[in-house]
């Protein structure tokens, strides 16, 4: 699996949700609505999710391995930092 594109679709300077991102894998599969969120320990990547009737949030798509999660997180956070720098400049 290779991440071939990361597009930051929306950047929020205020609030805990900082960005909405789309991640493309192998130029063949895209996951939309990946979020960059500011938590207590800094920024983290939240996968797209839906709210269940019980009020819980369940991931729609998510990485299976820790290595894949790390690759996605690094790529998304790097793209977010670049988008943030160009938005401020």
Curated annotation (Swiss-Prot):
GO terms for biological process: division septum assembly; sporulation resulting in formation of a cellular spore. Coiled coil: none annotated. InterPro entries: SpoVG, SpoVG_sf. Pfam families: SpoVG (PF04026). It comes from the Bacteria. Keywords: Cell cycle, Cell division, Septation. HAMAP family: SpoVG (MF_00819). Could be involved in septation. Belongs to the SpoVG family. This is Putative septation protein SpoVG. It comes from Heliobacterium modesticaldum (strain ATCC 51547 / Ice1).
